[in-house]
């Protein structure tokens, strides 16, 4: 029988980490939130906070060893991943595993695993370690192509390139948006897909794997803009997606929730990417499911039962973005937005803003997806981010 309180340390304290912290505290956990800047969203609700350079191996090891948490939950990609393996050797549980975190934070490693070792369907791709290599590799994939850093988040450094003349600019953008030290990009064929989906996949201590209803979403420059649940898939498409998600998450191992992304192209389901943690497109589950992705993650991590996952008939989310650079923020239009029935707002509490930064999300339910999406869109459009 699981005994509480458990001590949970979050490595990264953004909006997703904040919801994980809240879910952990609801079941009696002590939460320590870590990030590179003070007053990050999860720190605002945590029991303790630590500010440190998250990519500094020595600083990360010292911080975790000082607290000796029961579990360490990485919430961001920009981490000293080599420290996670050392922590596992110390007997500290890393979620889902140190290896899974290391593999999935690098597009080349997860693509080599999924498309190579596991033979999952993916877009055709190549790697390039210089602008010259990029110019050599891209034409064989056909135009347009998508160029991405092997390590980045929230779409940073991604470009769609229509022809050879745009490759040097795409290389420069990838290097500017990259995290880590690898001067390498992945270049992919551009898929003319019908839909992008996220399949939230939950691995439990008892060995069982559960799935949430698929979530449809739209991206702009590689960054999530809106999502809806349930996405409409045929039974065969759902079977393909679940089989691929089960295969790749079983290989990665560990427990917890994974966000597995796919493209739907006609009848084909094509693997895209994977996050070993709650997914931004899954914010919709705060209104769509009886157990949100954050609650599911905590239950799986701590070995607690998940009797059932139920989903509303139609629910949607729409992000709220900042338009300007601000060193302190306030909001208007909240009262207007909440006049929409069956609608909620989630303002993340980020202390500063910059153009395009995600500051919140509107969530809505409806009788059908078109209604839910329209409600979320209207509510999000009401909210303005202002200098305080």
Curated annotation (Swiss-Prot):
One of its GO terms (molecular function) is magnesium ion binding. Homodimer. GO terms for cellular component: cytosol. GO terms for biological process: 'de novo' IMP biosynthetic process. N(1)-(5-phospho-beta-D-ribosyl)glycinamide binds at residues 15-16, 75, 280, 350, 357-358. It catalyses: N(1)-(5-phospho-beta-D-ribosyl)glycinamide + formate + ATP = N(2)-formyl-N(1)-(5-phospho-beta-D-ribosyl)glycinamide + ADP + phosphate + H(+). Involved in the de novo purine biosynthesis. Catalyzes the transfer of formate to 5-phospho-ribosyl-glycinamide (GAR), producing 5-phospho-ribosyl-N-formylglycinamide (FGAR). Formate is provided by PurU via hydrolysis of 10-formyl-tetrahydrofolate. Mg(2+) binds at residues 261, 273. ATP binds at residues 107, 148, 153-158, 188-191, 196. Pathway: Purine metabolism; IMP biosynthesis via de novo pathway; N(2)-formyl-N(1)-(5-phospho-D-ribosyl)glycinamide from N(1)-(5-phospho-D-ribosyl)glycinamide (formate route): step 1/1. Its EC number is 6.3.1.21. Residues 112-302 form the ATP-grasp domain. It comes from the Bacteria. It comes from Parasynechococcus marenigrum (strain WH8102). This is Formate-dependent phosphoribosylglycinamide formyltransferase. Keywords: ATP-binding, Ligase, Magnesium, Metal-binding, Nucleotide-binding, Purine biosynthesis. InterPro entries: ATP-grasp (IPR011761), ATP-grasp_carboxylate-amine (IPR003135), ATP_grasp_subdomain_1 (IPR013815), PreATP-grasp_dom_sf (IPR016185), PurT (IPR005862), PurT/PurK_preATP-grasp (IPR054350), PurT_C (IPR048740), Rudment_hybrid_motif (IPR011054). Belongs to the PurK/PurT family.
